[in-house]
Amino acid sequence: MSNIDKEKAVAAALAQIEKSYGKGSVMKLGQRPNVDIESVSTGSLGLDIALGIGGIPKGRIIEIFGPESSGKTTLTLHLIAEAQKKGGTCAFIDAEHALDPAYAKKLGVNIDELIISQPDTGEQALEIADTLIRSGGIDMIIIDSVAALVPKSEIEGEMGDAQMASQARLMSQALRKLTASINRTNCITVFINQIRMKIGVMFGSPETTTGGNALKFYASVRIDIRRIGSIKDKEEVIGSQTKVKVVKNKVSPPFKTADFDIMYGSGISKEGEIIDLGVKLDIIEKSGSWFSYNSVRIGQGRENVKQYLKDNPKISNEIEKLVREKSSKVTNINFEQEEEVND
């Protein structure tokens, strides 16, 4: 078959597929109207840079996992706030029945516009999510959490009944169904997950996430979030130092990490990240305990500089813009980059 005949045969096949399944069901990659991946900021400057595209990708499945009180829900609430700032409609499937509206509001979430559901079973939660995604009107949906998606058979059964792998089967079936709708509607779907310990592991990490392996495969981005220390004001603990690692990334190089502060009552400290990344990129000069920007001293001590940036949003935004611009041109800004990951 000559090249011309091949081209005609392919064109005929494409026309037949479009006739059967609709326009846009198949095309050459270069014909796609938007090859660049759209993203939504995470609310963390360092994490946006570590993800490689300025945030989490639209139309993909995201998994955020970590130990208890590590900042999983805080990070997802920041995601909602950032999506709402861009005019997006967000939904929160609260399977844990633990969402605090007052805290969400403090983090910038417009709770009046946030769609919330507190389902009774895992099947109900995932059916609600599927209906919302297929509507095409939802830009982001959060499912909190995979561990709380308890199958109906387990809820209706007796205490102590063995329900082997029922949750894993539920997740596998749901993700097969959801994936096409998520891609078609460009809806960001975030699953919050918990960590469990595998028994009898001699080598490698004994940690694993709940809900089987399906989510690990279907997720385009997996983010591991950990609390690594406390932030104190004299003797009072006012926040936690947090490290996130992008353990899987299908849209950019994976295994990058970022550090940020989560302040109790106000969430991720944007000013703290601007200072740390500004110093790493030589945008902010540090001499002893003094910090300077454009050769002008802006404060002594990190906490004082954070307050200065809060009081001067124009300068804060200016430095943030420079950090984003410079980080896109620099391949390594002292982010740790792991070489392997243990599930």
UniProtKB/Swiss-Prot annotation:
ATP binds at G66, P67, E68, S69, S70, G71, K72, T73. GO terms for molecular function: ATP binding; ATP hydrolysis activity; ATP-dependent DNA damage sensor activity; damaged DNA binding; single-stranded DNA binding. PROSITE patterns: RECA_1, RECA_2, RECA_3. Disulfide bonds: none annotated. It is found in: Cytoplasm. Keywords: ATP-binding, Cytoplasm, DNA damage, DNA recombination, DNA repair, DNA-binding, Nucleotide-binding, SOS response. Transmembrane segments: none annotated. It comes from the Bacteria. Coiled coil: none annotated. SMART domains: AAA (SM00382). InterPro entries: AAA+_ATPase (IPR003593), DNA_recomb/repair_RecA (IPR013765), DNA_recomb/repair_RecA_CS (IPR020584), P-loop_NTPase (IPR027417), RecA-like_C (IPR049261), RecA-like_N (IPR049428), RecA_ATP-bd (IPR020588), RecA_C_sf (IPR023400). The keyword DNA damage applies. GO terms for cellular component: cytosol. The keyword Electron transport does not apply. GO terms for biological process: DNA recombination; DNA repair; SOS response. Belongs to the RecA family. PANTHER family: MITOCHONDRIAL DNA REPAIR PROTEIN RECA HOMOLOG-RELATED, RECA. Can catalyze the hydrolysis of ATP in the presence of single-stranded DNA, the ATP-dependent uptake of single-stranded DNA by duplex DNA, and the ATP-dependent hybridization of homologous single-stranded DNAs. It interacts with LexA causing its activation and leading to its autocatalytic cleavage. This is Protein RecA. It comes from Rickettsia bellii (strain RML369-C).
